[in-house]
Amino acid sequence: MKEYEVIRKSDNETIDIVFGYSKGDAFKRSGYEPENYDLVGGWYAD
């Protein structure tokens, strides 16, 4: 799985850390909407 930071687009604040096999998978698992949030990272987590 990869680790992503959840960034709120309105103020570019990092608000959460989520995990997923891809960016799309991480969005599904997190429940955040891509319209309002961005995921950055993609680091491999142990």
Listing of model-derived features with the role each one plays in the protein:
Residues 31-46:
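Short, mixed-charge low-complexity intrinsically disordered segments
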Residues 12-22, 41:
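A short, exposed loop/beta-hairpin motif centered on an aromatic-Gly-Thr core
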Residues 4, 24-25:
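General helical secondary-structure elements
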Residues 1-13:
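Short aromatic-glycine-(Arg/Gly/Cys) micro-motifs in beta-strand/loop hairpins
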